[in-house]
Every structure is written in C-alpha cells, then in structure tokens.
Amino acid sequence: MRVVILGSGVVGVASAYYLARAGHEVTVIDREAGPALDTSFANAGQISPGYAAPWAAPGVPLKAVKWMFEKHAPLAIRLDGTRFQLQWMWQMLRNCTTERYALNKGRMVRLAEYSRDCLQALRAETDIQYEGRTGGTLQVFRTQQQLDGAAKDIAVLREANVPFELLSSDELKKAEPALAAVSHKLTGGLRLPGDETGDCQLFTTRLAALAEQLGVKFRFNTRIDALAVAGGKIAGVQCGGEMVRADAYVVALGAFSTNLVANLVKIPVYPLKGYSITAPIVDAAKAPVSTVLDETYKIAITRFDERIRVGGMAEIVGFDKRLRQARRDTLEMCVNDLFPGGGDTANASFWTGLRPMTPDGTPIVGRTPVPNLFLNTGHGTLGWTMSCGSGQLLADLMSGKKPAIRADDLSVHRYLSETDGEHRPAYA
C-alpha cells in the first residue's frame, strides 16, 4: 500500500519506519529542511512511561489561579481570541477530576510502556545511537504536600506494574549524587528506574536514515496546503502546484494537524507552548546523571553526553513562538538551584516549541471517519516517549493486524458523536 505521511517529527518518522518495515511504500512530506526541526528539535530529552500523565489533574484549576501571580509559574494563559481555545480549556477543566485523571493516566501509561518496549527492540535490532541513558528518572518534591500527593500516581503505577522507588530527601543522592548538596531543600522523590533519556532530534535523524534504508522517501522543503477529497475519501495532498497521491494518508503534524483536517474531522489538538535551554557541562560531578523532574516548576533537567537540557512549562497562547526572557530566567533558576555549578547556563541555547495537546492528555492514534485518513498526533509533552509505540500501533492498524495493546480508546472516535450527520467533538 502506498502511504503518505505528513510530518517528519519523531512521531511522523517513527510511523514511516514501522510502516515501511511492514512492507508499505512510504513517502514523508514536511515543510522543514530535515527531520525533527520543529516540535521534536529540543524537547526535554526524557522517555518517561511511568510519568506519563495528563496536565488535566485534580487540583490544577486552583493551582492555575495561584500561578497567575507567581514569577516562575509553570503555566501561563493568554487568550488568543479563538472559540477553539476557550472550548479546549473548558474540556481540559472537565478532565480535572479524580476519575478522569485515573482513566487518562492509565491509557497514557499503557501506550508509553508499550512504546518503551518498542524502542528497546529497535535499539537491540539496529543499535541506533542518540546519547541515550537508561538511568531512570527522578521526580523531586520541595514540599510535604507534593510528596503526599504522589500517592495517586503511585496507585496507577502499581496497577500498571511499573517499578518505582519512593525516596526520602537523604536517599535522593543514591540516584543523583549531585543532589546531596541541596537535599535540605527537598522533601523526597519518586524514582522510576525503568525510564530512559536521550537526544530526540538526534534519534529522529538517525531513525529517518534507517527508514530510508527501508525505502522511505522524504520530501523536505515542501509546503502542505490541503487534503483533497473525492468520493468520501482523501484523493491527494495539495503541495503547492502539485497533487501527491497515495492509497492512505497519515497526519502527524503535531499542533498543525487540527487545521489541516478541520473540514473532515474535528480534533481537539491545541498548541501548548514549552521552552528549553541546552547548556554545556562545566563540572560533571555537579551535573545530573539522568533526568530530574522538579515538581514545583514542572521542569525536566536531563543529562546528555556533554550537555544539560532543561525544559518544561506550558503556555496556552496559540501559535505564538516568541522567546520570552522570563521563561529562560525560570529554566536557569531551576537548574542552578538543583545543580549549582553543573552547567554553563549563561552560554546555553534557548528554544521554544509547540506541543500538540489534547484536553485529556491522551494522543489520537488510528483511524478516522474518512476511510483512508489516519491520525498520529496529540502526544503533548510525551511525543518521544510514545513515538515508537504509536508508530508500531498505527502500522499494525493500517496493515490489518491486531495491535499488541488495546487501541480503541486511543483513536479520534473517543471524541466524536454523530449529530445530524456531522462529526462533532464530544470530548468524552
């Protein structure tokens, strides 16, 4: 089957690789000059199945009000004048209940755990290198309330059989020796030894090369204008003056997926703006050895070979990609507070990207009401964590194979209801 994939971020490239491995003829189209040059370029660098959790959580509405008045708040909201933004925020609030949080986190962990298994199999088969580390991830708490609040996450981890360790402040240095100098600031931590880290952009570039060896064709610097429809199916992709045709089409354009398919199916994928800095290491003994998540500021600090990546925060501001100095100040403050002297933050690069977020946090992977149109988008902050599993899952669905995990609650159909023949967002 001839398949066109729109988008060459980590999710699009993973989709291409697994579809090609399943025997399909795959072409990837992207406006950028190469793979992973947009949302996947400088993310936080973590592969964290156990920490897969929706931003829509109990207590978040009250926290959001408090964060409005804090200098280093992890969340900021600026109205963009669209009805879609208001609708999306309202549906996110509806998912901030204990019941929905558990449901959403459960299916996110399911896909994320499967994705890690797929990544491990890929690594064993291809020996792909991406500055990866398998030292686990450590979530650190600055208050007793945060430590006590970890109970709801631990319950889901137990149910999913995800290994974890709950550490006291004195025990944190066992996982991250450099934290010994600042343990008095922390109340404890939750460590997931099975999590991994690495450079997502490097991984995606090398996976694209492996995909090319399987026959995948990449068309970069190519504008994607519209999906052409005929006879109730996609007839092609309008790329400037050219119509690119295939048997099936996959939209993996992150936050840009929503507008492209708007006339065909309504998907609640909104851009959630995040930031990162990447600093050279100046003292390895004072730097992290893996990924540390600061629960207070919602920031991840990740060790690469010779660099530290610090990323996080969320701004609900539409497609605004301006770099804000205040956000850089927060990232620098956080890493220098936990790992003083570890990295040269004054000479760090500064980046922003738009995460494709759904109101319930779960991505949209699978079929749509249009017979030959498939989606692989809405992964939020977990694009890399879920990329290999999402790609394999989609390849199985498109090849007529039964997926290795439950997939029905991951498709767009969980959001759709039939009303007067139209597909309207139900946000279930």
Curated annotation (Swiss-Prot):
| GO BP, one annotated term | D-alanine catabolic process
Q: Which reaction does it catalyse?
A: a D-alpha-amino acid + A + H2O = a 2-oxocarboxylate + AH2 + NH4(+)
Q: Which residues bind FAD?
A: 3-17
Q: Which UniProt keywords apply?
A: FAD, Flavoprotein, Oxidoreductase
List, alphabetically, the GO terms of the cellular component aspect. cytoplasm; plasma membrane
Please give one Pfam family short name. Answer: DAO
Its pathway, per UniProt, is: Amino-acid degradation; D-alanine degradation; NH(3) and pyruvate from D-alanine: step 1/1
A GO molecular function held by the record: D-amino-acid dehydrogenase activity
UniProt function note:
Oxidative deamination of D-amino acids.
Enumerate the PANTHER family for this protein.
Answer: D-AMINO ACID DEHYDROGENASE, SARCOSINE DEHYDROGENASE-RELATED
Query: What is the name of the protein in this document?
Result: D-amino acid dehydrogenase
